[in-house]
A protein has these predicted regions:
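Membrane-embedded alpha-helical bundles of multi-pass transporters/translocases
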Residues: 2-465
Length: 465
């Protein structure tokens, strides 16, 4: 029987546009924050990396906290929309603060300014906004195909935004003066764009009534649970742990690709190549996302598509390594595009997989924790992206890199090559292995079949009586 449809085309586009706002923060932060702090503000990469790592200590708590708060929220707008809408106001303010370190401050005060701004952005406001935005996947439709389509629309907007930010920011900053004040100006413009688009996205969709989400069952007050119980429900779900780990690996991968600004500047001697490689990454991703819903239907599920895609991604990244040592930029771009094409399907249906993961908890534990379940998206983004950026700082510091120097030692150049060529390949291999174990769709089908058999047996027994 065909599933009920809940969304119009404009709902899907409206929802998807929300990741323009998310990537105005995330792509800008991960691609350019470190180079801004080291080369324009003059801070040490190793110290910045350590501060980012310390900041991540707060994230595990705040992700579960905000996920639990979303599950407990009951408002006219729904569970997630208020958090998505109001959380972004803080995102916009703190994003500007991260790129507006006052030059008049002493060195210690500059580090403190950055740490406070970065922690508030990632640990509080981005968490509230991003978990709520992701949770809408399971709160505005129960249709599995629509959930896949939402993921595709979302990440088409995400990668388009990431592409534009990576492609134009270096030139944009140069046109604004190329100094620390120029970075602040660009951050203000990006923050305003994000705030407007996030508001439009939040208002373009409507959450379903809780009775419909719970298949006609109305929760009573005895079914409420706290953050500790929600955490226990999460760790009992092996698929949640796999998705969380995969998300972290993806963001580590992204941080290394973002560190390509150093590789292009010092190894390839042309910082403008960073924007060209952004096209090689994001255009194939967008193409793959367009076809993901069709391929999911053709292969009757997401598992095979995701796994086969990442086999292709591993092959592509291995060939990037070969091309890098050959010194061929055109081949590096071609194989980068091949890898991105393979990564696309997982990006497109990831939110639908998380919705299936949430369904798995409902089938095994009898409780819905949609908001808390989507904490893996924010947790993975922040821990993976944050630790990835921190690792970049540590590795640069270890290699002897000094941002304001006219030349860099060979040890720094070798480290940049390792970060940009080898680490993305290693992370892709680990993701491929995780995806090979992540067949939550089949697990849910088996559980539903078992419940139907049990229900039939109860019906037969009562008929006999």
């Amino acid at each position: 029987m065909e599933e009920k449809k809940y969304l119009k085309w404009y709902n899907k586009i409206g929802y998807g546009s929300g990741d323009v706002a998310g990537n105005v923060v995330y792509a800008f932060l991960t691609s350019f924050m470190m180079v801004y702090l080291t080369d324009s503000v003059g801070l040490a990469a190793g110290v910045v990396g350590t501060l980012i790592a310390v900041s991540k200590l707060f994230d595990g708590f705040t992700d579960i906290f905000f996920g639990s708060m979303i599950d407990k929220t009951h408002s006219k707008m729904g569970k997630a929309k208020p958090w998505m809408l109001y959380g972004y106001i803080g995102c916009a303010i703190t994003l500007v603060c991260c790129f507006a370190v006052p030059v008049s401050l002493g060195t210690t005060a500059k580090y403190a300014w950055f740490f406070i701004s970065y922690t508030l952005l990632n640990g509080v406001f981005y968490t509230a906004n991003n978990i709520a935005y992701s949770a809408l996947t399971s709160l505005i439709t129960k249709n599995s195909k629509e959930r896949v389509q939402m993921g595709s629309y979302r990440f088409i907007f995400a990668f388009s935004t990431s592409l534009l930010i990576q492609a134009i920011t270096v030139g944009f900053v140069d046109k604004c003066g190329g100094d620390a004040a120029a970075w602040r100006t660009v951050a203000i413009i990006y923050a305003i764009i994000g705030l407007v688009v996030n508001t439009i996205s939040a208002l373009s969709v409507k959450e379903l009534p809780e009775e419909e989400l719970n298949e006609g069952e109305v929760k009573d007050d005895n079914e409420k649970y706290g953050m500790v119980q929600a955490f226990k429900l999460l760790v009992k779900n092996k698929y949640y742990m796999m998705i969380c780990g995969t998300y972290i690996l993806q963001q580590l991968y992204g941080a290394m690709i973002g560190a390509g600004i150093y590789y292009m500047t010092w190894v390839l001697k042309n910082k403008n190549l960073f924007g060209q490689f952004a096209w090689a990454v994001n255009i194939p991703l967008i193409i793959a996302l367009i076809f993901t819903p069709t391929l999911v239907g053709k292969w009757k599920g997401m598992y095979k598509l995701n796994l086969r895609g990442y086999v292709l991604a591993v092959i592509g990244r291995a060939l990037v390594v070969v091309a890098g040592y050959m010194g061929s930029v055109p081949l590096m771009m071609a194989f980068t595009a091949l890898a991105a094409l393979g990564q696309g399907p997982w990006q497109g249906d990831m939110n639908a997989v998380i919705a299936s993961c949430s369904e798995y908890t409902y089938l095994t534990q009898g409780k819905r924790i949609d908001g808390t379940m989507y904490s893996c998206t924010s947790l993975g983004v922040k821990i993976g992206g944050g630790i990835g950026t921190a690792v970049v700082g540590w590795m640069l510091e270890l290699s002897g890199y000094v941002g304001k120097n006219a030349t860099q030692p060979q040890s720094a150049l070798d480290m940049m090559q390792f970060m940009y060529l080898w680490l993305p390949l290693i992370f892709d291999v680990l993701i491929m292995f995780a995806l090979s174990r992540m067949n939550v769709e089949d697990a849910n089908k088996k559980l539903k079949a078992e419940k139907e058999i049990a229900a039939d047996e109860v019906t037969d027994a009562s008929d006999m009586n």
